[in-house]
Amino acid sequence: MKTRTLGKTGLQVSEIGFGGEWLERHPYEESVELIRYASSKGINIIDCWMPDPKSRSIIGDGIKGNRDQWYVQGHFGSVWKYDQYCRTRDMDDVKPAFEDLLARLQTEYIDLGMIHYVDSEEEWEMIQDSDYLNYIFELKDKGVVRHIGMSSHNPRVARKAALSGYVEMLLFSIIRPSICCRPVKTSTICLLRLLMHP
């Protein structure tokens, strides 16, 4: 498996990552084995944006025994509430959701602490100097989060993050289901160049 340097983190990650979405829809042991199989083939980065307890527990059991072989992305603001996914910046929900993530993944740290799903410039501005962002910085200072990343689908917001000085990597989908048949816009190509050659 070929690897690449991930953003400004210095981490050497596999060119193919493991996205854990929909793991909970499959038999538990089958999903755990799939994660272990991916690791045996050289995949070393896994995204855990999903807040549902089953998905998190599956990933925890899948990386158990070889945690040091994985770079784990954990998202701040992706919470499980009323038996469904919710996106929030409310610290009364964000903190317990992150603590649950650590517990279910059976780990003391997250390699990539992700600012979860920022798709508007207004929201980007709102989280600056917020308790939400300060919490992530505090966890990075303590070593609980090794690097700070962000997920977005908006090129303007992603560019602001790339230039922020503290976001070290971006999870940015250039293919969204709603636009998968349209050509990639020039602004997206410019953003990718900025991320690869800051």
Q: How would you label these PLM feature ranges?
A:
Residues 51, 63-92, 116-119:
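Structural motif corresponding to the early beta-alpha repeats
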Residues 118-198:
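Beta/alpha (TIM)-barrel catalytic core signal, keyed to glycine-rich beta->alpha loops juxtaposed to Asp/Glu
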Residues 19-29, 79-95, 121-125:
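Active-site mouth loops of central-metabolism enzymes
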